[in-house]
Swiss-Prot record:
It comes from Exiguobacterium sibiricum (strain DSM 17290 / CCUG 55495 / CIP 109462 / JCM 13490 / 255-15). This is Galactokinase. It is found in: Cytoplasm. InterPro entries: Galactokinase, Galactokinase_bac, Galactokinase_CS, GalKase_N, GHMP_kinase_C_dom, GHMP_kinase_C_sf, GHMP_kinase_N_dom, GHMP_knse_ATP-bd_CS. Keywords: ATP-binding, Carbohydrate metabolism, Cytoplasm, Galactose metabolism, Kinase, Magnesium, Metal-binding, Nucleotide-binding, Transferase. The keyword Membrane does not apply. Belongs to the GHMP kinase family. GalK subfamily. GO terms for cellular component: cytosol. SUPFAM superfamilies: GHMP Kinase, C-terminal domain, Ribosomal protein S5 domain 2-like.
Length: 390
């Protein structure tokens, strides 16, 4: 679907032409999983897949939302003075949430608007379709209402939508990667301080492949919040030994001197701490052009997520183990929260087709339904895009 078609559909649905167009990417996390809410480091990048929006301000206080991904929902109309979450509004709650959070922060959004959304991120695949929607609405509101929002503040508002409005206790990585992404670069983020560094991703001769299990995962209904609680309990136990504010401040050398009474909490903490160290090592490996070492760190990350953090499951393990068995694979791991969703692999360019065929066959044989495969391109963060046909 071209952007011109989006404009035509906007006019069909809302009766007037749109005035602005916006895009926010999805994201993958190359390494650093379940570290963001533990005060550690993550290493995500923005994708060229994402969420498109076209919009127009209104003269009244009504907000109208329409998504081509949920056409059966029709136009969702909301009064500007009633932005409380409603289950019947589904996806539109993320848009309502951003309006609500910005108003609460003191930004003036005194009239309504019409918004048409089209996402090309598979919903529920773990590529941050919800954070992409939050950020495309954020940049849209910033432009339409001349709010002049600092970009890192906008990232934080996106997280507030997730945490306080939707009720999912997520970290800040997804919104940060989507708001701050840069084409051709990964982004090393310290989730404790929000210090960040761009790292050029020179994967010449290799392709990033996203492997979707096609097993839906609902973050709010998964064991995600349970893992957060377990990490908080593990940190409280560890604070008897060192007064660190987060697991991300611990080193593995320090951790290995501690005896745990609860083996489950020990494993959860071991993952958070070791994964943080792997993420920093991965940045060094990329800087030094040691791609094989980077791939080995990806593999170790998946093993830790499987054994110590227990967030992979049969589908993700089947994909990743099949990927490891193929020639020309630097590394492979699950990405995102887990419990289904996606894995990623870095594969030699000339083996991409045979890789997808072989892994797809192994997966469908074991699981009983097919996986989906996408080649990923690293793109820029959330932004207004020009009003030209592409």
């Amino acid at each position: 679907m071209t952007d011109q078609t989006l404009e035509q559909i906007f006019e069909q649905q809302f009766g007037q032409s749109s005035t602005h167009r916006f895009f926010a990417p999805g994201r993958i996390n190359l390494i650093g999983e379940h570290t963001d809410y533990n005060g550690g480091h993550v290493f995500p990048c923005a994708l060229t897949l994402g969420t498109h929006a076209v919009a127009r301000k209104r003269d009244d206080v009504v907000f109208r939302f329409y998504s081509l991904n949920f056409e059966d929902d029709g136009i969702i109309e909301v009064a500007g003075d009633d932005l409380t979450p409603q289950s019947a509004h589904g996806w539109a709650n993320y848009a309502k949430g951003m309006i609500h959070v910005l108003r609460e922060a003191g930004y003036r959004i005194d009239t309504g608007c019409d918004i048409l959304i089209k996402g090309d991120i598979p919903n529920g695949a773990g590529l941050s379709s919800s954070a992409s929607l939050e950020l495309v609405i954020g940049v849209l509101l910033d432009k339409l209402y001349n709010l002049d929002i600092d970009r890192i503040d906008l990232v934080k508002y996106g997280q507030q939508v997730e945490n306080q409005y939707i009720g999912v206790n997520s970290g800040i990585m997804d919104q940060f990667a989507i708001g701050m992404g840069k084409a051709g670069s990964g982004l090393l983020l310290d989730c404790e301080t929000l210090d960040y560094t761009y790292a050029p991703l020179d994967l010449s001769g290799y392709t990033i492949i996203i492997m979707n299990t096609n097993k839906r995962r609902e973050l709010a209904d998964s064991k995600y919040n349970e893992r957060r609680s377990e990490c908080e309990a593990a940190l409280a136990y560890l604070q008897q030994y060192r007064p660190y504010a987060s697991l991300g401040q611990w080193s593995m050398n320090e951790f290995e001197t501690v005896s745990f009474e609860d083996e489950r909490l020990e494993r959860r903490a071991r993952h958070a701490i070791s994964e943080n160290e792997r993420t920093l090592q991965a940045l060094d490996a990329l800087k030094e052009d040691r791609l094989e070492a980077f791939g080995q760190l990806m593999n170790a990350s998946h093993r830790s997520l499987r054994v110590d953090y227990e967030v992979t499951g049969k589908e993700l393990d089947t994909l990743v183990e099949a990927a490891w068995a193929q020639p020309g694979v630097l590394g492979a791991r699950m990405t995102g929260a887990g419990f289904g969703g996606c894995a990623i692999a870095i594969v030699e360019d000339d083996t991409v087709e045979t890789f997808m065929t072989a892994v797809g066959h192994a997966y469908e044989t074991e699981i009983g339904y097919p996986a989906s495969f996408y080649t990923a391109t690293v793109g820029d963060g959330a932004r207004e895009v020009e009003q030209e046909v592409i």
